[in-house]
Amino acid sequence: MSFVIWITGPSGAGKTTLANALYKKLESMGYRVELLDGDGVRRKLYPNLGFSEEERWMHNRVVVEMARRLSRNGIITIVSVVSPYRAWREYARKEIEKFVEVYPRCPLEVRMKRDPKGLYSKALRGEIKGLTGLDGEYEEPENPEVVVDTDKNDR
């Protein structure tokens, strides 16, 4: 039994927290499981990759392929990645046989308060532009298999 859990949302929504909790739970139950964190994949495989739309699309495709291969080899794969556009997530859904989309829904004010990477602070100071979910577009999933209101519980 293998499948891919694709957790998508803007920075601070709770993707990593949710992914880590799922990973620990599934591993403790004896399942073969891997966690692909978008930031971690980027850091390890191509640390100099930028954040243009084309570069983010390439990053998304790489993560899709990694998840597809892991799942095909019997490993439950948890993906934690922004993937801001519905079309990108639909691409993942088409490429991955057993795909579960999880949306950690969280209001902007809560994400800004959490600000785990300091991105919202930088954006508000004008140091970065186009932050997904602030002044950069994030298309909320229309029909995810799971929605978690992460503002209700920070852990």
UniProtKB/Swiss-Prot annotation:
<dbReference type="GO" id="GO:0004020">
    <property type="term" value="F:adenylylsulfate kinase activity"/>
</dbReference>
<keyword id="KW-0418">Kinase</keyword>
<comment type="function">
    <text>Catalyzes the synthesis of activated sulfate.</text>
</comment>
<feature type="region of interest" description="Disordered">
    <location>
        <begin position="134"/>
        <end position="155"/>
    </location>
</feature>
<dbReference type="GO" id="GO:0004781">
    <property type="term" value="F:sulfate adenylyltransferase (ATP) activity"/>
</dbReference>
<comment type="similarity">
    <text>Belongs to the APS kinase family.</text>
</comment>
<dbReference type="GO" id="GO:0070814">
    <property type="term" value="P:hydrogen sulfide biosynthetic process"/>
</dbReference>
<keyword id="KW-0597">Phosphoprotein</keyword>
<keyword id="KW-0067">ATP-binding</keyword>
<keyword id="KW-0547">Nucleotide-binding</keyword>
<protein>
    <recommendedName>
        <fullName>Probable adenylyl-sulfate kinase</fullName>
        <ecNumber>2.7.1.25</ecNumber>
    </recommendedName>
</protein>
<keyword id="KW-0808">Transferase</keyword>
<dbReference type="GO" id="GO:0010134">
    <property type="term" value="P:sulfate assimilation via adenylyl sulfate reduction"/>
</dbReference>
<dbReference type="GO" id="GO:0005524">
    <property type="term" value="F:ATP binding"/>
</dbReference>
<dbReference type="InterPro" id="IPR002891">
    <property type="entry name" value="APS_kinase"/>
</dbReference>
<feature type="binding site">
    <location>
        <begin position="9"/>
        <end position="16"/>
    </location>
    <ligand>
        <name>ATP</name>
    </ligand>
</feature>
<comment type="pathway">
    <text>Sulfur metabolism; hydrogen sulfide biosynthesis; sulfite from sulfate: step 2/3.</text>
</comment>
<dbReference type="GO" id="GO:0005737">
    <property type="term" value="C:cytoplasm"/>
</dbReference>
<dbReference type="InterPro" id="IPR050512">
    <property type="entry name" value="Sulf_AdTrans/APS_kinase"/>
</dbReference>
<dbReference type="Pfam" id="PF01583">
    <property type="entry name" value="APS_kinase"/>
</dbReference>
<dbReference type="GO" id="GO:0019379">
    <property type="term" value="P:sulfate assimilation, phosphoadenylyl sulfate reduction by phosphoadenylyl-sulfate reductase (thioredoxin)"/>
</dbReference>
<dbReference type="InterPro" id="IPR027417">
    <property type="entry name" value="P-loop_NTPase"/>
</dbReference>
<feature type="active site" description="Phosphoserine intermediate">
    <location>
        <position position="83"/>
    </location>
</feature>
